[in-house]
Amino acid sequence: MDFGLTNNSIKAFEDQKLLHIHQSCVSYPSDTLICSIPVSAKNVDLNIPFKNILWVDKTGPNSVTLSYVSRSSKVATKCWVDFVENSDQFCEYLLDVAYKGIKRSRRFIVFINPHGGKGKAKHIWESEAEPVFSSAHSICEVVLTRRKDHAKSIAKNLDVGSYDGILSVGGDGLFHEVINGLGERDDYLEAFKLPVCMIPGGSGNAFSYNATGQLKPALTALEILKGRPTSFDLMTFEQKGKKAYSFLTANYGIIADCDIGTENWRFMGENRAYLGFFLRLFQKPDWKCSIEMDVVSSDRTEIKHMYEKSKNLAPMSESSDSDKTVSTSPESHLLTFEINDLSIFCAGLLPYIAPDAKMFPAASNDDGLIDVVIVYSKQFRKSLLSMFTQLDNGGFYYSKHLNYYKVRSFRFTPVNTGKRHYFALDGESYPLEPFECRVAPKLGTTLSPVAGFQLLDI
């Protein structure tokens, strides 16, 4: 479709979902005026995917202001577009294609942990993410958390009907708080229908990367803004009569010790866990435990086939209460392990436990199963180093040094060895005492592109 006063100067290519604007029609806030005509300092044509368009406003019969996320600078950008044949028609068309099937001007409550990770969450929100939402005419109510569990207490009492979503600007710890605040409500089933999203701003940003595939806050914000309600599994965690929810991992062994045992290194960001890992490689492994698991499969070929099948299924855009029960098929069986030579026990729901750590290559966001990795301490350094070098792409899935399971639930009992060890739930420290986890299929909701988390090849 052609929208310019001259042929092909302003054109929408619907098959490519792309807007093309000739450089002669574009000017930016920093541009100068020559004879009252804006002269662009960027002497290139503008090509914007429909998805990247945030908003468009009429400024005159033949001119508009256009806000979009730049593919090159990856930030919210604003420009003026002149020589439009009919600005009313142009604005209506662009907003229709930019938000096709998606609610415009969403309302969010935003939790920001100003002290989490490297302490940059507030700056990240204000300089990178917020401009995307404000340019899209979204309403954002910001809450700066002041203490531990502050976000949890607000989420527990939140009027969920007043918002279209929750934004968590921080790391996985803040997201864990929000999830558990919703989980403590009497109406938790209804509350969990409210999408909970993450803008990366902490030392661990795993959920954000799993849900959007983006690292940059502005691009993450764009994916959320243009995202559709998407279900994801949770785990219920029970310990001494207390209940919590997990969206990511439950782990014991060297990974938990590297995570929780390096809390005082949070200023290092995601690098703290890697330093902790290498330091602990030179310590004698002495993790012991008893595990009982309701196993669906321990055959990696079969697990891969299950995963490939789930990849080919059409993504679900909305979850219903009827979805939130554990399927009775495929069949499962109980297995019990007494492990005196453990290196890693890690149970998870999503592929990435960090943006560069694909711990569960066969995990999908809503398959109703928990992925479990067990690594024994035989050939301790060799097996862990081999695994570590392939962690970024999940290549260790085929390693002979690990055991991989798909389970519905498990009961875990640590054995006291006299050494100080840790247990971590979503990267948060929990008592090192017996506990039980069960999958809660499709209980959580987020805003994700194409109504589904990206499932990559194993």
UniProtKB/Swiss-Prot annotation:
GO biological process, alphabetically ordered: calcium-mediated signaling; sphingosine biosynthetic process
Residues engaged in binding substrate: 170-173
Keywords of this entry: ATP-binding, Cell membrane, Endoplasmic reticulum, Endosome, Golgi apparatus, Kinase, Lipid metabolism, Membrane, Nucleotide-binding, Sphingolipid metabolism, Transferase
Sequence positions that bind ATP: 113-115, 145, 177, 202-204, 266, 272, 426-428
Catalytic activity reported: a sphingoid base + ATP = a sphingoid 1-phosphate + ADP + H(+)
Protein EC: 2.7.1.91
A cellular component term, taken from the record's GO annotations: plasma membrane
Domain DAGKc: 103-241
Active site, renumbered: 172
Membrane topology, record value: Peripheral membrane protein
SUPFAM superfamilies per UniProt: NAD kinase/diacylglycerol kinase-like
Any one GO molecular-function label of the UniProt entry: ATP binding
Name of the top EC class for this enzyme: transferase
Source organism superkingdom: Eukaryota
Pfam families: DAGK_cat (PF00781), YegS_C (PF19279)
Function noted in UniProt: Catalyzes the phosphorylation of the sphingoid long chain bases dihydrosphingosine (DHS) and phytosphingosine (PHS) to form dihydrosphingosine 1-phosphate (DHS-1P) and phytosphingosine 1-phosphate (PHS-1P) respectively. Involved in the biosynthesis of sphingolipids and ceramides. Involved in heat-induced transient cell cycle arrest. Accumulation of phosphorylated sphingoid long chain bases (LCBPs) stimulates calcium influx and activates calcineurin signaling. Involved in heat-stress resistance.
Protein name as it appears in the record: Sphingoid long chain base kinase 4
Gene source species: Schizosaccharomyces pombe (strain 972 / ATCC 24843)
Source lineage: Eukaryota, Fungi, Dikarya, Ascomycota, Taphrinomycotina
Gene (UniProt): lcb4
